A protein has these predicted regions:
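Short, acidic/charged, Gly/Pro-enriched secondary-structure junctions
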Residues: 71-102
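Solvent-exposed edge beta-strands and adjacent loop segments
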Residues: 1-71, 100, 104-125, 135
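Short acidic DE-rich linear segments
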Residues: 137-141
Length: 141
């Protein structure tokens, strides 16, 4: 194994609606397939019938401003949920190769309006749901 090909989070970047976030701690975005169990008489096997997918995840940040949380709360308060797009990029600084994804139909499902603790850096956990994930750039072997 060539350790210079390994990726790590230090090469990760997130853009929300075109704005690069410099305060990201971690991201975990995934698609989950929805499958129905199908059992047929005379066949002991259970089959999985694909019925669609759901996109969800969490953006973890260090709190440096109130802009994103305010946008989420305003959407909840006015019933006008913003149309949000997220771009992710993780790159290997040695090889210069990168993987990028675009998430569309993004909605933030939760926002903590106040959360802090003495002698602790404030972190925000922002759960999302999304409708589409498109690979913009992939790393080949």
């Amino acid at each position: 194994m060539n350790r210079n090909k390994l990726l790590n989070g230090n090469g990760g970047h997130i853009w929300v609606d075109g704005e690069l976030l410099g305060n990201v701690k971690s991201v975990d975005f995934k698609l989950t397939g929805n499958f129905a169990d199908i059992a047929c008489c005379g066949d002991p096997a259970t089959y999985a019938a694909y019925e669609g997918y759901a996109g969800e995840g969490t953006l973890e940040t260090y709190k440096v401003n109130s802009e994103l949380v305010t946008k989420i709360v305003e959407g909840f308060s006015t019933c006008v949920i913003p149309d949000t797009k997220i771009i992710t990029k993780v790159e290997n600084p040695v090889s210069g190769r990168a993987e990028r994804w675009a998430l569309t139909g993004v909605v933030f499902t939760e926002a903590a309006v106040a959360k802090f603790e003495a002698q602790k850096t404030i972190e925000e956990s922002l759960p999302i749901k999304f409708t589409h994930a498109e690979n913009l750039e992939k790393i080949k072997g």
